[in-house]
Design a protein with these regions (language model features):
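Transmembrane-helix signature of polytopic, membrane-embedded enzymes
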Residues: 6-29, 64-74
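Membrane-interface alpha helices of multi-pass inner-membrane proteins
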Residues: 24, 72-91
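Transmembrane-helix motifs of polytopic, lipid-linked glycan transferases
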Residues: 1-14, 52-56
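Perimembrane helix-loop-helix junctions
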Residues: 56, 61-65, 72, 83, ...
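Membrane-interface anchor segments at the N-terminal boundary of transmembrane helices
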Residues: 192-219
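Aromatic-rich transmembrane-lumenal/periplasmic boundary elements in polytopic membrane proteins
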Residues: 119, 123-130, 138-191
Length: 219
């Protein structure tokens, strides 16, 4: 599903179908996406919703400049849902909110520079919609993502939900373990040291198994 989303995002940004096709083909052939999808890591869900949120935000920005905030409520709402699902998939989705916020407020400034009448009303609508769709809705989606816990254990409540959040934060903020194939972040664009996820052991004679994750520097 990342492929059509990337196609749509590139087409909205460039207005050129052939370039969007090339972009979609590049992500379709990206080994990192393929490997993580095949082994069902949770990262692929977060990445998908981050890309979907970016697509909706670009759609929102373009619509605001053409029709005003009142004509951009649909992409605003869909973008908020995508952002919430991304956060519910993995906390890395929260970081995408910074980029979305820059675009969200940046297009308001661009709209103001157009000097269209009724901007004050648009600004109020943008503020109300931003709080509703990018704060309230994502928070509700995140909390509801724990509903299976409630189904499994009816005694599960908000206190237990909060304990889950603090446990995850402590775990990731205090984690000291290392990985034999870890690499410095600045080497990632060129994939100088791809991560080796798995090497098969205790297999029958003559059998080998290996899973590695490395992306395309072009992407």
């Amino acid at each position: 599903l990342m492929v059509p989303v990337m196609y749509g995002l590139c087409r909205r940004l460039t207005r050129r179908p052939w370039l969007a096709f090339v972009d979609g083909a590049l992500i379709a052939l990206d080994f990192m996406r393929f490997a993580q999808s095949r082994i069902a890591t949770i990262d692929v869900y977060g990445t998908f919703f981050i890309l979907l949120g970016a697509l909706c935000m670009v759609w929102y920005c373009q619509t605001v400049l053409e029709k005003g905030v009142q004509g951009a409520l649909l992409p605003m709402a869909l973008g908020g849902v995508a952002f919430g699902l991304g956060c519910a998939s993995k906390w890395t989705g929260i970081y995408s909110g910074a980029g979305l916020a820059v675009l969200y407020f940046g297009v308001l400034w661009a709209r103001y520079k157009q000097q269209k009448p009724g901007f004050a009303r648009e600004l109020k609508l943008a503020f109300a919609g931003g709080v509703a769709f990018y704060v309230v809705v994502p928070l509700a989606i995140y909390i509801l993502s724990y509903f299976p816990y409630k189904v499994h254990d009816p005694s599960f409540g908000l206190a237990d939900w909060w304990n889950c959040q603090t446990f995850m934060y402590r775990y990731h903020s205090q984690l000291k373990s290392t990985h034999a194939f870890e690499s410095r972040w600045y080497t990632w664009p060129m994939m100088l040291r791809p991560v080796w996820y798995y090497m098969g052991k205790y297999l029958p004679a003559g059998m080998f198994a290996s899973i590695a994750g490395f992306g395309s520097p072009v992407v």
